[in-house]
Regions:
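Glycine/Thr-rich phosphate-binding loops of Rossmann-like dinucleotide-binding domains
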Residues: 15, 61, 266
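Conserved beta-strand elements of the Class I
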Residues: 5-6, 52, 205
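Beta-propeller and closely related beta-pinwheel folds
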Residues: 22-194, 229-240
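Structural motif
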Residues: 8-11, 55-56, 208-210, 260-261
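Hydrophobic or amphipathic alpha-helical targeting/insertion segments
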Residues: 2-30
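Beta-sheet repeat architectures centered on beta-propellers
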Residues: 1, 99, 137-154, 160-334
Length: 334
């Protein structure tokens, strides 16, 4: 929010850190005065500049009143004022469809809010209501709080029952590797699933834990630039060199940046955190190898896995290959 960094502990307090304050680098973040003390998610609505809490308290400061479907937003440009009055723009809203809010993402024209069953939009409309809420999808809930992104006015997300897109209408996305993903997915660790955009190549990737892992070990990618309605392009990556826990697109740093969790204990320095292990920070699309500190540069292997197909079967022109009808005699070399 401007030069103020805001961070939320899931189901906990919200903190602020002012980068412009004197001795800022030696000053700890502080709990935001007047803000809810227990919330599932949080973001800043732009350009109207309201701080919004999702799955939060009906009575501010009383954690026992946390309602997983309740939304509370501050007055405009005042992150300390959350009590609605005739003089401010603070307010509240409770969503009806679902049992808990799973996550929210800022979009081009609205904030997208997902419960465990449904999709809602939250649009700034000004006085007297400040925001308008609309349910725009059912049976399409979000699988984890970081499993959705918005790109070019469209929202993409991973649900418990497939992949979805919203472009003004709800669409279930055809995914050629859906069984491969969902048949080996740790749904208990669903909050680890992380979705990131690589706009340099027009790709959306979901990093997820397999059924035998408690950390992200595999990914599935959708090419939103090259896909068509009849020819969606998906690919997976199970390389041990490419698990990622978070991802930030090149729009922020010029190149994609990501992190990886290494569960092995590094005895060269003290580790402070919830579990033993280290997090490694990567800048992507730099060079051709993966380089970790203290290790040898390694190229991430490329491979293609295909399945059986019958070249004698007629296909609609362009539907399967984006090429002409390929029936006829000849050699098929793999």
């Amino acid at each position: 929010l401007g030069s103020t960094l805001i961070a939320l502990i899931h189901n906990g307090e919200c903190f602020q850190w002012d980068a412009d304050a004197a001795n800022a680098t030696s000053t700890r973040a502080t709990i935001i005065t007047g803000a809810p003390t227990a919330s599932r998610d949080m973001l800043v609505s732009t350009p109207d500049r309201h701080l919004v809490f999702f799955g939060t308290e009906t009575t501010i400061g009383n954690k026992a009143t946390q309602d997983d479907m309740f939304i509370r937003f501050s007055s405009q440009e005042n992150i300390n004022d959350y009590t609605p009055t005739a003089e401010n723009s603070a307010g509240t809203q409770r969503l009806a469809a679902g049992s808990r809010i799973m996550g929210a993402t800022l979009g081009r024209n609205a904030i997208y809010i997902w419960s465990d069953t449904s999709l809602f939009t939250m649009r700034f409309v000004g006085t007297p209501f400040t925001f308008a809420f609309e349910q725009v999808g059912t049976n399409c809930g979000l699988i984890g709080m970081n499993a959705a992104v918005e790109v070019d006015g469209a929202a993409y997300w991973m649900s418990d029952n497939g992949f979805f897109r919203y472009t003004g209408k709800l669409e279930s996305m055809d995914c050629l590797v859906e069984d491969y993903v969902y048949d080996d997915l740790n749904t208990t660790s669903n909050q680890l699933i992380y979705c990131g955009i690589n706009n340099l190549f027009g790709e959306i990737t979901w990093f997820y834990p397999t059924s035998t892992s408690n950390v992200n070990t595999r990914s599935v990618t959708y090419s939103y630039l090259d896909s068509t309605a009849k020819r969606p392009i998906w690919f997976t990556n199970a390389s041990t060199l490419f698990p990622r826990t978070t991802w930030e697109d090149s729009a922020v740093f010029g190149l994609p940046h990501a992190t990886k969790y290494n569960a092995s204990d590094d005895t060269s320095f003290d580790v402070t955190g919830n579990t033993e292990g280290t997090t490694i920070y990567f800048e992507h699309e730099t060079g051709v190898n993966q380089q970790e500190a203290g290790t040898t540069a390694v190229a991430i292997p490329a491979n293609i896995t295909s399945g059986d197909y019958d070249i004698t079967q007629k296909v609609v022109r362009g539907a399967a290959t984006n090429m002409a009808d390929l029936r006829g005699d000849g050699e098929n070399i793999m």
